[in-house]
Amino acid sequence: MFRSSFDKNLENATSHLRLEPDWPSILLICDEINQKDVTPKNAFAAIKKKMNSPNPHSSCYSLLVLESIVKNCGAPVHEEVFTKENCEMFSSFLESTPHENVRQKMLELVQTWAYAFRSSDKYQAIKDTMTILKAKGHTFPELREADAMFTADTAPNWADGRVCHRCRVEFTFTNRKHHCRNCGQVFCGQCTAKQCPLPKYGIEKEVRVCDGCFAALQRPTSGSGGAKSGPRPADSELPAEYLNSTLAQQVQTPARKTEQELKEEEELQLALALSQSEAEQQKPKLQSLPPAAYRMQQRSPSPEAPPEPKEYHQQPEEATNPELAKYLNRSYWEQRKISESSSMASPSAPSPMPPTPQPQQIMPLQVKSADEVQIDEFAANMRTQVEIFVNRMKSNSSRGRSISNDSSVQTLFMTLTSLHSQQLSYIKEMDDKRMWYEQLQDKLTQIKDSRAALDQLRQEHVEKLRRIAEEQERQRQMQMAQKLDIMRKKKQEYLQYQRQLALQRIQEQEREMQLRQEQQKAQYLMGQSAPPFPYMPPSAVPQHGSPSHQLNNVYNPYAAGVPGYLPQGPAPAPNGHGQFQAIPPGMYNPAIQQPMPPNLQPGGLMQQPAPPGNPQMMPPMPENQFANNPAAILQLPQQHSIAQPPQIPFQPQPQQIPGQQPQQIPGQQPQQIPGQQPQQIPGQQPQQIPVQQPQPQPQMGHVMLQQHQAPPAAQAPPVTEIANNQVQAVAAAPAPPQNEPGPAPVKAEEPATAELISFD
């Protein structure tokens, strides 16, 4: 059924009926490859067939066998497995296999091999394969460095040569060449006549080795027993079975001392050696210590002999000498000495030395936890056991005794074995703690990065808020600047308006002053007023060419319809207001001139006779009355239906601001509506001249209707122009003639003026 033992072992190792790997069969496969019973090429071909099995368990076990031969069979298998074709086969196998556990195992193997041969250019194909698989998106498991450790020793490759490597005899047809399995060199038949197993290469059966390698391999066992007896020439004549047996390896000479004596001597030498080494190490430290600590160190008890070896097996932790462990735990005692020296040097004043110091009361600087104390005790105990074991082995080697017969060595070995398992548990626990602390450190790093990112975001947010605040402040300043500009413009307009009002007020005051000066000048020129002249018939004075007519033409330039006269009716005041400008008594005011009746219009002056029945109303006036008193022209009687308006002294006109109601001058009465009783001027008698009622004219009736319908609003003519005209008229007027016709009556439509306001 099976062609060879390799096929049988491979079938057992890759059977799908197994629940766990068959490690004995796997190790036998490795031994067969190392012993050259199977070539690496054939072995790898058989394993590839098992890898392509449809059963996932068989495929997984075949990968486990492949991993074992790669780790244990050395360079020949490496050169066979890590070729370019086989690496491409691994990639295709990963793509084609439907089983997840097989795929993960293959990825783990590729990663382990790539890491193990990362520094070797000879196996570049497996590293390229891993790179390609990563590029394709395959996820590799976590790498464990322990899986990538290839520490197994492999047999060297066979060298080739034409002569023997030892005796230099040339190989011929009859003198065949042979290779030593231990060193790999080529030898003749006589130089490779011996055989022995090679456990370090995984070769359990006896194989051909050269004489030099055989002597080197047999020297540790034969040299320990025959170191003092010397080499025996008869050993070569003994059979190989006897030489390989345990009897030949034992000491053949009788022991000079008993086992108990040797044990006691060995323990004594061990204690002396430990004491000497401890003293040598503590000597430089004791020189630096203060005298008190040195004396306390001298009072420490001396070490005692260790207990019997038989107690090691029963109580492994209590087998060590506590005093010896105290000496071996140097770090603890050094720390105690440092603490003692620091406690002694801390007080400023020297304190007296107590007679009996108690070192056990002095606590170390750092208080250790219970787990740390337990681990320290275990480490000290194991260190002591290892040193005792090493010293025992050295003692046996120096005395030439067999180790197999020493029960103390065996007991120490069993004790160290039990301590080793406990040490592994402690190591695992420490590794777990280390990983936990590393995770904490990673989390702290993440927290630190997160805090840095948060601080950066906070800074950006603060910067953003600052920019927003600056933008708002800039907009607020712009708005304030615009408002300030608008307010400045309004202020300038208001100041300009106030300036105009002030200038206008000053102009009005100047006009008033000029008007007053002109009035005073006119009054001064006119002199005192004369009594009114009597009524003159129209026939007594010629109509045209008389001096009075010329005087009227010169002196009355405001009469309507006459050349040189201004239009009738009140003119608007130059200041834009409709208030009445008062004229002092005795001054002719053309603004209140009434329309002349038909008998007094130009061309018909003094043509109508006096009304009969009232001759006494107008006494006769001398003809030269106008010549002596030119102001008498202004005192002519008006119509009988309209009383002469009183002369109101001039008052300054108040300035009116646009948008406000016109203010009335205090003390000024409103003008009297026609039909009321006229007011008389103080100091002057009203004169009534009987005048015939003129025929009503349509134009006058229309004017009177408008005046009755509208409220009376007295308007003053331009004061400056009136004053200038009056001054020119008075200056250029000739002497009045003797026969002066009657003056033109004032307009009858003039409403009644307000009461006279005195300046007193």
Curated annotation (Swiss-Prot):
GO terms for cellular component: cell cortex; early endosome; endosome; perinuclear region of cytoplasm. A zinc finger (FYVE-type) spans 158-218. Residues 349-358, 609-622, 734-744 have a biased composition (Pro residues). Residues 307-316 have a biased composition (Basic and acidic residues). GO terms for molecular function: phosphatidylinositol binding; ubiquitin binding; zinc ion binding. Residues 653-694, 706-733 have a biased composition (Low complexity). CDD domains: FYVE_Hrs, GAT_Hrs, VHS_Hrs. Gene3D superfamilies: 1.20.5.1940, 1.25.40.90, Zinc/RING finger domain, C3HC4 (zinc finger). Residues 263-282 form the UIM domain. It comes from the Eukaryota. One of its GO terms (biological process) is exosomal secretion. InterPro entries: ENTH_VHS (IPR008942), HGS/VPS27 (IPR017073), HRS_helical (IPR024641), UIM_dom (IPR003903), VHS_dom (IPR002014), Znf_FYVE (IPR000306), Znf_FYVE-rel (IPR017455), Znf_FYVE_PHD (IPR011011). Residues 275-323, 338-359, 602-626, 644-760 are annotated as: Disordered. Zn(2+) 1 binds at C164, C167, C188, C191. The modification Phosphoserine is found at S300, S302. Residues 13-141 form the VHS domain. PROSITE patterns: UIM, VHS, ZF_FYVE. It is found in: Cytoplasm, Cell cortex; Cytoplasm, Perinuclear region. Keywords: Cytoplasm, Developmental protein, Metal-binding, Phosphoprotein, Zinc, Zinc-finger. Zn(2+) 2 binds at C180, C183, C210, C213. Homodimer; in vitro. Interacts with ubiquitin. Essential role in endosome membrane invagination and formation of multivesicular bodies, MVBs. Required during gastrulation and appears to regulate early embryonic signaling pathways. Inhibits tyrosine kinase receptor signaling by promoting degradation of the tyrosine-phosphorylated, active receptor, potentially by sorting activated receptors into MVBs. The MVBs are then trafficked to the lysosome where their contents are degraded. This is Hepatocyte growth factor-regulated tyrosine kinase substrate. It comes from Drosophila melanogaster.
